[in-house]
């Protein structure tokens, strides 16, 4: 009876209820997300070292980031148009196949700056998938379940992180380059499989069918021209602008952390490369405990206070990293712990906050416009972070501290969105 009671209690958990109440696309996309998350997290701790070990410098890494972000703006603009004309499902499949499946194939054979740049540019094709994937995930879901769905998306990625020690073990035995080459090849195969599953088990959303019918006889260039009407509506929405501002700041921070954390802890703090696979595990464990055990106890309709607290914790974490003594694993572990709690508070809410502030009828093109704007505004900072790292590896993280303070000031002026029960 005790076991049955526990199973019954598990079924009644708010996160389980979110999946139970949102079948079809949301459930399918959440369940197959590990096909992206597992290989991505196996590679992520070593991706920068993979380039650095093969002669790509800090400045070149920053240059790759900035160049690809410019290309991403182009793909992002067309992402919303393609999501309307071709449908959310087909556009998602295209982005997964070319932006990840083919890009990872090129990464698996890259050995110089130009090949790494080519792979990164090909990966920009994934931007057309960003808009379509989010539309496919949420358009047939209930608005009040958005934080829960975004929490599930985060959980899918976090569970995948527990596979990260495998890459650490392989790197310890065979070195970075050959291991990462094989992992990129595996990543290519899993993304092709993900594309096939999306084709088989997902369906076009109601809004996607409407937009596809409305745009059937409208040219791509005419739809591109219609952005001139969408841009003013975007600029006049204070709620959207504030949500976009926070998204831009966190996007820049993610660029810094993803590309320069591994260099900082190995090259400046002197920690072993093998630990790079351990840090994501701690991060994932803390976030999972928080999301499963605590997240649902925080009202899903409250955004401002949890976001502000999360950003404050991010700032504390940045200070811990900046002032970490050399060879001090404890400081870095504490940094990871605090960052994980911050991410659990911030990530689902900043995504849901943005979606609740935009017009559902124009979600695809508005999301594309917002994504393009986010990348465009962030693009100079990849090179800047690379230059800062070349001067002093602490400087990129000091820069993120300033960004967190700015984001906190923005959140202070955000109004709580009205969450309705009707379908999105």
Task: Give a label for each model feature.
Residues 197-214, 412-423:
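Helix-loop junctions on the cytosolic side of multi-pass membrane transporters
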Residues 121-157:
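Cytoplasmic helix-loop-helix junction between adjacent transmembrane helices
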Residues 34, 103, 114-128, 329-345:
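Hydrophobic core of transmembrane alpha-helices in multi-pass small-molecule transporters
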Residues 12-71, 239-280:
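Helix-loop boundary and gating motifs at the non-cytosolic
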Residues 90-105, 305-320:
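Structural signature of the two symmetry-related core transmembrane helices
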Residues 2-26, 203-244:
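Juxtamembrane intracellular "pre-TM" segments in multi-pass secondary transporters
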Residues 150-168, 371-381:
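Glycine-rich segments within core transmembrane alpha-helices of 12-TM secondary carriers
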Residues 76-87, 172, 290-303, 389:
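Helix-to-loop junctions at the C-terminal end of transmembrane segments
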């Amino acid at each position: 009876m005790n076991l049955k009671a526990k199973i019954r209690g598990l079924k009644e958990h708010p996160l389980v209820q979110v999946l139970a109440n949102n079948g079809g696309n949301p459930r399918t996309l959440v369940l197959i997300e590990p096909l992206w998350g597992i290989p991505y997290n196996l590679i992520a701790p070593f991706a920068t070292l993979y380039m650095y070990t093969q002669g790509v410098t800090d400045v070149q890494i920053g240059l790759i980031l900035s160049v690809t972000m410019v290309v991403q703006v182009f793909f992002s603009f067309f992402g919303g148009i393609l999501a309307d004309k071709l449908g959310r499902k087909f556009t998602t499949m295209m982005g997964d196949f070319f932006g990840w499946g083919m890009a990872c194939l090129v990464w698996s054979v890259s050995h110089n700056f130009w090949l790494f740049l080519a792979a990164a540019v090909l990966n920009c094709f994934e931007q057309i998938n960003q808009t379509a994937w989010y539309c496919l995930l949420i358009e047939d879901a209930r608005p009040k379940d958005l934080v829960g769905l975004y929490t599930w998306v985060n959980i899918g990625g976090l569970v995948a992180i527990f596979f990260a020690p495998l890459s650490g073990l392989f790197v310890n035995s065979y070195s970075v380059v050959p291991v990462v080459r094989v992992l990129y090849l595996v990543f290519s195969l899993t993304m092709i499989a993900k594309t096939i599953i999306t084709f088989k088990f997902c369906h076009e959303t109601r809004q996607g069918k409407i937009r596809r019918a409305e745009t059937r006889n409208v040219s791509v260039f005419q739809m591109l021209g219609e952005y001139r009407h969408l841009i003013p509506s975007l600029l006049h929405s204070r709620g959207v602008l504030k949500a976009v501002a926070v998204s831009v700041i966190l996007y820049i921070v993610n660029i810094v952390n993803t590309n320069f954390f591994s260099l900082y802890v190995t090259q400046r703090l002197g920690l072993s490369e093998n630990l790079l696979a351990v840090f994501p595990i701690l991060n994932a464990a803390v976030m999972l405990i928080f999301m499963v055990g605590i997240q649902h106890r925080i009202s899903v309709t409250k955004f401002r206070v949890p976001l502000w607290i999360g950003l404050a914790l991010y700032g504390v974490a940045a200070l811990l990293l900046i002032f970490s003594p050399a060879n001090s694993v404890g400081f870095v572990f504490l940094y990871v712990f605090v960052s994980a709690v911050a991410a659990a508070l911030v990530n689902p809410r900043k995504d849901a906050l943005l979606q609740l502030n935009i017009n559902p009828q124009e979600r695809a093109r508005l999301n594309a416009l917002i994504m393009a704007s986010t990348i465009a505004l962030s693009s100079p900072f990849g090179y800047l972070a690379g230059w800062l790292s070349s001067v002093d590896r602490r400087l990129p993280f000091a820069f993120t501290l300033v960004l967190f303070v700015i984001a906190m000031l923005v959140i202070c002026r955000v109004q709580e969105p009205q969450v309705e029960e009707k379908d999105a």
